[in-house]
Design a protein with these regions (language model features):
Chain A
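Short hydrophobic alpha-helical membrane-anchoring segments
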Residues: 32, 36, 62-65, 114, ...
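N-terminal signal-anchor module of multipass membrane proteins
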Residues: 1-41, 277, 285, 289-293
């Protein structure tokens, strides 16, 4: 049995919201890119919507992360070394929080540019222009942005694992869990936000995607609990109210998994989207809070 | 360059007087927390932003008849930052606020730390705490300011039993070896040095003589003395695999077909 004596860092609501927003922002950007590259011509509208929503979520990420700091005005110390006589940039590849800071900055740039262009095209669409297809370089740009988005969605889990805190450091599956759940919540959010833009075919495809993501999340969840059990740390996450949260998390996977099994479109789109998104938030709450007591 | 310095804390002569706690707070102007009174003499409970020295009382001696030769005693140990050679806190700190000083000690620069608290979850000893007053992570500095004035740390200066000894590491190692040999000669077979060699985080500048296993004192043993970076590769790999599967699944599910209402945008 692994023994830990680390103290709790006091990462609570701001960090939880940051991790949640990061999953949504990264996930929306990735789904928008897939729609742009592989979707139908009509899906381009949904792709633009994804890019338009990803950027405000990234802005929220920055706000949540900064507010959580003990000295928010010194947030830039993450990037610039202010040690007297040292100077230069802070770059520690072995520290996920250090890489993540840069990834967040870069993804912010990519999502901002995508946001601006998507907004411009959106205006043209409203004006009735016919040719709204993005130029080739936009697709390359979006692929790079998607890689950063996936990193943003997943590194938050790696930050937790790369520690000596019980639960977090006892499992290597948290990053996988966060990226899978981020994609799942994003698909649910996109289906809900884009219900006026999507036709029946697009809705069905989004639900199928969410089903795949939920399946991936379920596998990651099983790995998470298996790794904790192997480390003898299950009790540190299944105590108090948290076992109830974990049950709710598992239950929240049912709507997308059912949609995966059924050929017909699942009913209650808005409600099931809400259940999926709430489940993803609850999962982050359970992971973050249960380990700190 | 000054010689590496540190603490040798000999728990066999600690009497639990807490003079070290008081001296540390006085010198470093730490207000301390509200005392926590429970079933024991330990009212500080832990190391944190306000407690840079903490006298642990391992007082769970079972009730029973004590005869000559089978007695049991409380264990006491003045705990402190270990100033590890391979420091987990320093490894993860994204701002480089945690540095190794010219005395080979580990120091958090208050003006550089922005209070992200990653070091707290990394420190395997639960040493570092977050101060809401300063907005930064705080821990023992090994009295960095006193060292610069050729003074010994406050805790070592006041310790009435010399349980806490300060000095150059080479001198402290020699003293610790001699003390351990004396205890073993007296039949204290459980006595052991913790952090004297490089098996715990490459060696600790603040090392201990313990009268029982490290776990009894709430210290990780050799198997559990691991750095956060051990999880980097596995965690990134799992995340990468999940992301790759997610993208593949997304492409498979979201790709447009003629049946789904039009040709793919990429080929439009």
């Amino acid at each position: 049995m692994t023994e830990h004596f680390a103290a709790a860092p006091g990462w609570e609501w701001w960090i939880t919201l940051y991790f949640f927003s990061a999953g949504l922002a990264g996930g929306l950007y990735v789904l928008a890119t897939i729609f742009r590259l592989r979707g139908t011509v009509r899906d381009e509208s949904l792709a633009r919507m994804g890019f338009i929503w990803a950027f405000p979520l990234v802005v929220l990420c920055g706000i949540f992360l900064t507010v959580d700091l003990g000295k928010p005005l010194d947030f830039w110390h993450m990037m610039i070394n202010t040690t007297p006589g040292a100077g230069g940039l802070n770059w520690k590849p072995w520290s996920p929080i250090s890489i993540g800071t840069w990834a967040l900055l870069l993804f912010s740039i990519f999502s901002f540019v995508a946001f601006v262009f998507a907004s411009m095209v959106e205006r043209r669409a409203r004006a009735g222009e016919a040719d709204l297809s993005p130029p080739g370089f936009a697709k390359v740009f979006n692929v790079i942005g998607s890689a950063l988005g996936l990193f943003l969605a997943s590194y938050t889990g790696v930050v937790l694992s790369v520690s000596n805190q019980w639960v977090w450091s006892d499992s290597w599956a948290i990053g996988a869990l966060f990226v899978a759940s981020g994609l799942s919540a994003s698909a649910a959010l996109m289906a809900w936000l884009g219900r006026s833009r999507a036709d029946a075919s697009t809705e069905a495809r989004l639900q199928r995607a969410d089903g795949y993501f939920a399946l991936l999340e379920l596998v990651a969840l099983v790995l998470f609990f298996v790794t904790l059990a192997m480390a003898g740390a299950l009790g540190h996450t299944l105590h108090g109210i948290y076992w109830v949260l974990w049950i709710l998390v598992v239950l929240s996977l049912i709507p997308p998994l059912r949609a995966l099994g059924a050929r017909a479109q699942a009913a209650g789109g808005a409600l099931s989207a809400l259940v999926v998104i709430a489940g993803v938030l609850l999962m982050r709450i359970a992971v973050i809070f249960s380990a700190q007591y | 360059m000054p010689e590496p310095v540190g603490f040798f804390t000999d728990s066999s002569v600690c009497i639990g007087c807490k003079a070290c706690e008081v001296a540390c707070k006085e010198w470093n102007q730490l207000e301390g927390n509200t005392p926590s009174w429970g079933d024991g003499f330990d009212n500080t409970k832990q190391l944190d932003a306000e407690n840079w020295r903490h006298v642990k009382f391992i007082d769970n001696v079972p009730q029973g008849e004590m005869l000559t030769g089978n007695g049991a005693a409380w264990l006491m140990m003045s705990d402190v930052c270990k100033h590890c050679k391979n420091a987990a806190c320093m490894e993860v700190c994204p701002t480089n606020a945690i540095v190794r000083t010219e005395y080979d000690t580990v120091y958090i620069q208050p003006s550089v730390c922005n209070g992200c608290r990653d070091c707290i979850s990394a420190c395997p000893f639960g040493v570092i705490g977050f101060s809401a007053k300063t907005g930064a992570a705080q821990k023992c500095t090994l009295c960095y300011d006193r060292l610069q004035a050729n003074m010994q740390p406050a805790c070592a200066k006041v310790c009435p039993t010399q349980s806490i000894q300060f000095g150059s590491l080479s001198d402290l190692h020699a003293k610790a070896d001699a003390r351990l040999a004396a205890l073993h000669a007296q039949g204290n077979d459980k006595a052991q040095l913790y952090g004297r060699d490089d098996s715990i985080y490459g060696g600790l500048n603040s090392f201990f003589l313990l009268m029982d296993k490290p776990e009894v004192y709430g210290l990780p043993n050799k198997e559990n003395a691991v750095l956060p970076s051990r999880n980097n590769f596995k965690s990134y790999l799992a995340a990468f695999v999940a992301a790759a599967i997610g993208v593949f699944a997304g492409v498979k599910a979201l790709s447009g077909t003629p049946e789904s209402g039009g040709s793919a945008a990429g080929s439009a």
